[in-house]
Curated annotation (Swiss-Prot):
GO terms for cellular component: cell outer membrane. The keyword Metal-binding does not apply. Keywords: Cell outer membrane, Membrane, Transmembrane, Transmembrane beta strand, Transport. This is Uncharacterized protein YddB. Transmembrane segments: none annotated. Belongs to the TonB-dependent receptor family. It is a multi-pass membrane protein. The gene is yddB. Residues 178-790 form the TBDR beta-barrel domain. Residues 37-172 form the TBDR plug domain. It is found in: Cell outer membrane. InterPro entries: Plug_dom, Plug_dom_sf, TonB-dep_rcpt-like, TonB_rcpt_b-brl_sf. The keyword Transport applies.
């Protein structure tokens, strides 16, 4: 795979012209360098995935998370996608350089697509007050995208409201030279994979659930895509892409207390995507883009031990944006106006949730909980205006300057709604209601103004380039004035691109979590017959931020090998967590959010790849080796994020020792050392491409919370929370993808691809419990992919 490497950016193949035009707006760079490598890796904190890269990589469910899985700056939650739940198609959470997954910024064509409603809560459990969400506002199908850029360090000043990284997805723009129509079909099913299940989990796995944890013993995935590219008039055209990704999962309909299964039912998991962009090249000076976007996801669930608990949970996002580029005599002006609607919802089939000592479901009788909690939703409408002015380069003596300035205003209209009244209670032995709570119908909203100003300058002298910048953010949600310094320097040591050093310091302020305010609104609709109340306090919070020190090295070895090393050190400050207390006098439970969370992360990566592929007969061979290491310590669960309630603990017992809590290694996303060998073989005459990734992951540790019944529990430390780590073995996996584009079908351009993930069928434990029950990664998995271009 051909890529053009530029300090600060990676470009690829036919996309170079447009990508270079976009990237010129962000960062100074030296002369281009062309390399060949199977998998994009960071160059000075930027990784650029073109449509060619996306087609090469086995992208699983087709989400952005799947695309970024192999990036050395990224770590996945290894417990989220396992042998137990391969039928799920939702995007997985990602952590970038040790930051919480909910603190990443997602953009579509430069406009925020981040869901900041309740991104740390991905629970599928029934709840009357808490709505599931995730940080990706749009569940994009990457096969419909033109390119995706990950900014993991040295992030330019125009990007903000994140602690981890920025993921900017670009929708395809009209190109008269592209194919008119592309059709695609992709599939897998439970019969095509090997599941590794602990003996203690087999019964629950075969039933399809355990309480509110959902498994996929029997599923079929079918993905359909359609995209087209059409010229409508001179210098005016449109692109559009449609996709449906569907997983049909068969689970137990109801399981009694003694394990009797009463029927099975099929539950759908669906993600729809629709993207379109109209482009008008009005003149040499003016270009207009009108973008329309939509994704909708829905998931059907029931709690198998609760009759009549069926519910639908999902997300719907849609929006439009108008972008105008104006080339002035002395500068380039870009103006963007956009609107995005992002919503999450839970819709139960029933409005009453109750427990009774004696109930009947089919032929089964006994104590049970049944019903549902009505329909509840929350949403935000973001109205965006942003502009940026890039001055043309000018010189002062021997020093050249290229400053740019920008401003952004976003009005966020956030609201939450309970669409009908619901109730929950327990029927006691006397047949009377106890623990009775009424959730009243209601709707409430928050209006938030977000302001941003930024400026930076590209300063070059001989073979040294500097980029100082500063960003200012303010919003009236937390009412904090945040100033983010950004600085990067590049040094081309011999002025010939063979040896380059990049270094910098940057600060990144995070985004707001709207659910803290919306939850307080929902709590006001809750009436407890006993008089209990709930309050949420968040108004005095500081904005969480990360300080970053980073360095990158790039060295050409001989005539054909490129080596790159990157080091990133992050300190996370003022991370949000919570504490709860009860005022017995007023019967009020008060949840107070605080800034007690903190982490420190060391991240290092090293890669070797070729400037030119190896040619053996008619086969091009592209090898690549990537090492990455990420280690974090802190007092915050990355998964729980702002819902973490342990950060107030100054000391804990860890592996038998009383230690400071913030010195304990972070437990989740804990995959420190990874080494991968990527190898592509391309035979142009036959149209065959064979892509391979052999990945080794060092032994890692699973965190276990000890109870008094555990043998490792130390009674003299009973006043402290106690944790112990259990070692999980190292793993070796081999993923392969074979694609064939028959050269004798030039008009149709048919491509048939087969993915085999975990070819070796390695049995890798990813988690364990305090009773020794292990959870394993997925075994060998087959995917089939067919596409045709006209």
């Amino acid at each position: 795979m051909k890529r053009v490497l530029i300090p600060g950016v990676i470009l690829c193949g036919a996309d170079v012209a447009q990508a270079v035009d976009d990237k010129n707006m962000y960062m100074h760079f030296f002369e281009e360098m062309t390399v060949y490598a199977p998998v994009p890796v960071p160059v000075n904190g930027n990784t650029h995935y073109t449509s060619e890269s996306i087609e090469r990589l086995p992208t699983g469910n087709g989400n952005i998370s799947d695309l970024l899985r192999t990036n050395p700056a990224v770590r996945m939650d290894s417990t989220q996608s396992t042998s137990l739940n391969q039928g799920d198609i939702r995007p997985e959470k990602i952590s970038i350089h040790g930051a919480s997954p909910y603190q990443n910024a997602y953009l579509i064509d430069g406009i925020s697509a981040t869901n900041n409603l309740n991104p740390a809560n991905e629970s599928d459990a029934s709840s009357a007050t808490n709505i599931s969400g995730m940080s990706q506002g749009y569940y994009l199908d990457v096969s419909l995208l033109d390119n995706v850029t990950l900014y993991d360090s040295f992030v330019p000043v125009e990007f903000g409201r994140f602690n981890g990284g920025v993921i900017d997805a670009k929708i395809k723009r009209f190109n008269a030279d592209d194919s008119k129509v592309k059709l695609g079909y992709r599939t897998t099913r439970s019969d095509w994979l090997t599941s590794h299940i602990d003996e203690n989990n087999k019964s629950a796995f075969n039933q399809g659930s355990s309480g509110s944890t959902y498994y996929s013993p029997d599923f079929k995935k079918n993905f359909y895509t359609l995209s087209f590219n059409q010229e409508l008039a001179d210098n005016f055209g449109v692109t559009a892409g449609l996709s449906r990704r569907q997983s049909d999962i068969t689970r137990a309909d109801y399981v009694s207390n003694d394990g009797i299964v009463a029927g099975r039912a099929q539950y759908k998991n669906v993600i729809d995507t629709a993207l379109s962009k109209f482009t008008w090249f009005a003149s040499d000076r003016f270009t207009h883009d009108l973008t329309l976007k939509y994704t909708g996801s829905s998931r059907d669930y029931n709690t198998s031990t609760f009759p009549q608990s069926d519910r639908e949970m999902g997300n719907k996002s849609y929006g439009l944006a108008w972008d105008m580029d104006t080339q002035l005599a002395w500068a380039k002006l870009r103006t963007t106006v956009g609107w995005d609607h992002i919503s999450d919802y839970t819709r139960h089939d029933h409005d009453i949730w109750y427990t009774e000592l004696s109930c009947t479901y089919g032929d089964i009788t006994g104590r049970c909980t049944r019903g549902g909690l009505g329909h509840i939703s929350q949403a935000v409408d973001n109205y965006t205006f942003k502009t940026r002015l890039d001055w043309q380069k000018f010189a002062v003596g021997n020093v050249s300057h290229q400053p740019y300035f920008g401003a952004e205003y976003i009005y966020s209209d956030a609201w939450t709604e309970r669409h009908n009244q619901s109730e929950s209670y327990v029927i006691n032995a006397a047949g009377k209601k106890t623990n009775h709570t009424i959730y009243h119908k209601g709707k409430g909203r928050l209006g938030i103004d977000n302001y941003t100003l930024y400026m930076a300058d590209r300063i070059s002298w001989r073979n040294v380039s500097l980029m100082p910048g500063v960003r200012y953010d303010y919003d009236n949600y937390l009412s904090n004035h945040n100033i983010s310094p950004r600085f990067m320097t590049e040094w081309d040591i011999f002025a010939n691109q063979t040896s380059m050093i990049t270094a910098g310091y940057n600060r990144y302020y995070g985004g707001n979590i709207l659910d803290m305010g919306l939850r307080d609104i929902r709590n006001s609709w809750t009436e407890s017959v006993s008089g209990n109340k709930t309050l949420t306090r968040y108004q005095d919070l500081k904005t969480p931020y990360n300080d970053e020190l980073a360095m990158g090295l790039q060295q050409k070895i001989g005539k054909n090998v490129i080596a790159r090393a990157n080091y990133v050190y992050r300190e996370a400050h003022d991370q949000i967590s919570k504490s709860s207390r009860t005022d017995s006098a007023t019967k009020t439970t008060i949840t107070e959010y605080n800034n007690d969370g903190k982490t420190k992360t060391h991240s290092f990566s090293l890669s070797f790849e070729l400037a030119e592929p190896l040619h053996i007969r008619q086969v091009d061979i592209n090898p690549q080796i990537v090492f990455s290491y990420i280690k974090s310590k802190g007092n915050l669960s990355l998964n729980n994020g702002y819902e973490e309630s342990n950060t107030g603990d100054n000391q804990v017992v860890y592996n038998g020792n009383l230690v400071s809590y913030d010195s304990v290694p972070v437990a989740d996303f804990n995959n420190p050392l990874k080494i991968s060998l990527n190898m592509d073989f391309t035979h142009q005459p036959s149209g065959l491409v064979w892509a391979n990734t052999l990945a080794w992951q060092e032994a890692r540790k699973a965190r276990i919370i000890l109870g008094k019944t555990n043998a490792q529990y130390i009674s003299e430390y009973s006043d402290y929370k106690q944790y112990v780590d259990e070692k999980l073995d190292s793993s070796l996996t081999w993923d392969t993808r074979l694609s064939w584009t028959p050269q004798f079908l030039q008009q149709q351009n048919l491509t048939i691809s087969a993915d085999i993930l975990n070819v070796l069928d390695s049995k890798t434990a990813v988690d364990t419990t305090n009773t020794g029950v292990a959870t394993y990664a997925s075994g060998r998995t087959f995917w089939l992919d067919v596409s045709m271009k006209f």
